[in-house]
A protein has these predicted regions:
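Glycine-centered tight-turn motifs at strand-turn-strand junctions
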Residues: 77-99
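C-terminal motif of bacterial Sec signal peptides marking the signal peptidase cleavage site
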Residues: 16-19
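Bacterial N-terminal signal peptides that target proteins for export
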Residues: 1-8
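Bacterial signal peptide processing site
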Residues: 21-24
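Extracytosolic low-complexity repeat regions of secreted or lipid-anchored proteins
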Residues: 93-163
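Short, surface-exposed binding/anchoring microloops in extracellular/periplasmic proteins
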Residues: 30-82
Length: 166
């Protein structure tokens, strides 16, 4: 026979645990930025502060999508090894650091979100969210971070320090 105290403890535990369904456990270990090369083609820049990441994905924004629809995938690139420190992915010409070498171009009027993550763990970098038009007139040597319409601009040399403020 359960005592009133035991029943209260059990009910309290059930209520306390029922709120855990939305627990977010993703570990953020760096930042993703967007830049351009000397031809004006988009370049993803990933700063990893701790550990490693091994995949970059570009998806379109949520404009026009139903709540249950996923963002359209523009491309996913698997790194040839572990990304540490600062790494770059030229979207128009992925180099030998990437197993996936499919080039893509970004449309001026489209909204994009770029992420970097560790495939086998709940680890990622903070994403960058921008419109293709944000890259028009951008000079090489600078990196945008954050989310449109208020992107933060960093000199490329200072991007890692800004992303990993230890």
């Amino acid at each position: 026979v359960a005592t009133p105290r035991l029943v209260v403890l059990l009910l309290g535990s059930v209520v306390a645990l029922s709120g855990c369904g939305n627990l977010v456990t993703t570990e953020i270990v760096g930042a993703v930025g967007i830049s351009v090369d000397t031809e004006g083609d988009p370049v993803v820049v990933v700063a990893v502060c701790d550990g490693y990441l091994d995949q970059v994905a570009v998806v379109q924004g949520r404009e026009g999508l139903a709540e249950d629809e996923t963002n359209p995938v523009v491309g996913t690139w698997d790194a040839a090894g572990q990304l540490t420190g600062v790494s770059e992915l030229d979207l128009a010409a992925p180099g030998s650091d990437w197993q996936t070498r499919t080039p893509v171009s970004l449309e001026t009027g489209e909204h994009y979100i770029v992420t970097a993550r560790q495939v086998d763990a709940d680890v990622q970098a903070s994403q960058v969210d921008f419109f293709g038009r944000d890259l028009q007139g951008m000079e090489p040597g600078f990196v945008y971070t954050g989310a449109a319409p208020e992107l933060d601009e960093h000199e490329a040399a200072a991007f890692e320090a800004a992303s990993c403020p230890d």
